Amino acid sequence: MLTNNRYQGSLISSLARSLCLGTLSLSVVGIDSVTANQSLNVPTQTTISQLNVDLKPYIETYSQIVYLNYSDSRAQADTMELAIADFLAQPNATTHNTAKEAWIKARQSYLQTEAFRFYEGPIDYIDSSTGEEGPEGRINAWPMNEAFIDYVRGKSNAGLINNPNFEISIAGILENDQVTDEADVTTGWHAIEFLLWGQDFNDQGPGQRSHTDFLPNQGNNNRRRQYLELVTAQLIEDLMFLESEWKPDANNYRAEFINSDPQETIGKIFTSLATLSAFEMSSERIAVALDSGNQEDEHSCFSDTTHQDFVFNAQGIYNVYFGDYKGYDGLGFDELIELLSPELNRQIIVALDQTKSSISNINQPFDQVLASPMGSPEREEAEFAITSLEDQAEIFQQVGTVLGVDVEILAE
């Protein structure tokens, strides 16, 4: 069990649904209102103090989406592990491609879970008394110094794999993870990505590592094979931990989350959405790479799937706001905001759709955008996506005004 000290850190349709669920009491406390940020053209709106709304069902929907999404991510990582095992059993171009395709597919679920970060939940908690941290850094750290793991162009003996004094074990791999340099990443999605694809030296396609790097009993191939197996298993272990902490009807983080102060909890949820939008996606993953023009600043540079990262991060935000995930249709925050400010809800939906559209228009692979000259259509499309994400985050902050909570844009 994870306890709190480890985590310090249309109106009519909506109304009818809430009444059917027994979650809304229309006890008007008083007619007070707030004027929203005029730059966003949000009109006078009802505050949460005017309605006795039971917020818990919205939080329960959110929690179930988190659980289902992490469950899918773990299941798809299991499928990837099987594909990698088949590849290592019979290393050839076909099994190699199948393993790479499984990695790409598995990423799609995980990327949506990034909408659950930035409030020190199971994914990124920090225990100040022990220094223990959530597994986010082990799972998805980037950018990475690939030479810390394996050979790179011009350095055939680089990395832990080619160091005869380093014993390939999960303990050793974890002990060396991001110790002296945050770029010295030894685990997670991008370590697996590098091992499967190798370095990417052109803007026409992904890395071209050969399957022959994994033929047994040749050079350091056995060490490379073992390393790939171990970091894949570690990824699944970390995903299983996240899945278990959000499992329903258990003595875990989810139980505490649902029973915490509901307004404060919703503030955390929208801080997560705003931060993913404006800081992580807009700034760290698009703007930084555009400014440098360096392929190494791509989020998924080895596989050339950075565009997929943007698409499924945006989908994760969509899932949370509308309370939908695949076949699960819960009570969405769109329904809550519709009760309080239909115009704000409309603006959020417009912003979400604009972000999805602008991201879909980014040229792919993304390294072609980075290689494009300043002022080119390719760069302008990416810059428009940045603006859309920033606008989206600012509108999310207006939810804080309606609910009387803090919605922040955090910078790690």
Model-derived regions, located:
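Positively charged, low-complexity intrinsically disordered regions
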Residues: 7-9, 18, 39
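Mature extracytoplasmic or organellar-lumen-exposed domains after removal of signal/transit peptides
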Residues: 40-412
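Signal peptide processing junction and immediate N-terminal pro/mature segment
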Residues: 29-43
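Domain-scale selection of a single, long terminal region
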Residues: 2-3, 31-32, 74, 82
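Bacterial N-terminal signal peptides
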Residues: 16-29
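N-terminal secretory signal peptides that target proteins for export/translocation
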Residues: 1-13
